[in-house]
UniProtKB/Swiss-Prot annotation:
Family annotation (PANTHER family): 2,3,4,5-TETRAHYDROPYRIDINE-2,6-DICARBOXYLATE N-ACETYLTRANSFERASE, ACETYLTRANSFERASE
Catalytic reaction(s) noted: (S)-2,3,4,5-tetrahydrodipicolinate + acetyl-CoA + H2O = L-2-acetamido-6-oxoheptanedioate + CoA
Pathway: Amino-acid biosynthesis; L-lysine biosynthesis via DAP pathway; LL-2,6-diaminopimelate from (S)-tetrahydrodipicolinate (acetylase route): step 1/3
This protein's UniProt keywords: Acyltransferase, Amino-acid biosynthesis, Diaminopimelate biosynthesis, Lysine biosynthesis, Repeat, Transferase
Top EC class for this record: transferase
GO biological process: diaminopimelate biosynthetic process; lysine biosynthetic process via diaminopimelate
Family annotation (InterPro entries): DapH, DapH_N, Hexapep, Hexapep_transf_CS, Trans_hexapeptide_repeat, Trimer_LpxA-like_sf
Protein name per the record: 2,3,4,5-tetrahydropyridine-2,6-dicarboxylate N-acetyltransferase
Known EC number: 2.3.1.89
Annotated Pfam families: DapH_N, Hexapep, Hexapep_2
Repeat keyword on record: yes
Source species of the chain: Bacillus subtilis (strain 168)
Molecular-function GO terms, alphabetical: tetrahydrodipicolinate N-acetyltransferase activity
Keyword Repeat: yes
Amino acid sequence: MKMMDANEIISFIQNSTKSTPVKVYVKGELEGINFGESAKAFINGNTGVVFGEWSEIQTAIEENQSKIEDYVVENDRRNSAIPMLDLKNIKARIEPGAIIRDQVEIGDNAVIMMGASINIGSVIGEGTMIDMNVVLGGRATVGKNCHIGAGSVLAGVIEPPSAKPVVIEDDVVIGANAVVLEGVTVGKGAVVAAGAIVVNDVEPYTVVAGTPAKKIKDIDEKTKGKTEIKQELRQL
């Protein structure tokens, strides 16, 4: 797994072409109308759908008011610097409603559940499950075979660029609604209890709980049984 440097991310955002993509349903005398250099138009008779940049399509609509009877615009972002990750070739299970930005690394057989938000530079290891409504901030790094519980937040660090990101090592289980703050490393095989706020590093194979989170015990057989990672959920 490769962790992106903060300055790489800053440069990527700074130099990206900002985009306001739209989908426009249009009706009228459409033959011969140029909707813009970036546009893809699917026209059938006097109706059609156009995909492209709003600045170009808006100009075409204004210049052809006499021909266009009606139109409806679908738009979900404005001057966006970072596109969404292309999911088609990711060897993972990604459920509807997950928001995953470009420049995110997702390992094979990972699971991303509904409502998860994963920011640029994040890394998700093989076989790791990111549960519903989890937030992975910029550069948050999660190892292999982890479970990040529903509603948890792994804080992001892009600025200041010198700051250390959150690192979750392999085989970690984080309970629902836990928060791991910037710069924290959670060691291999550790368990973070539900609702904990983790402000300091967590030793491997320990259990932490509370606000702020503190060690309550070492991992034992009972804890292993309660936090078992089921590979059946990760099969494609």
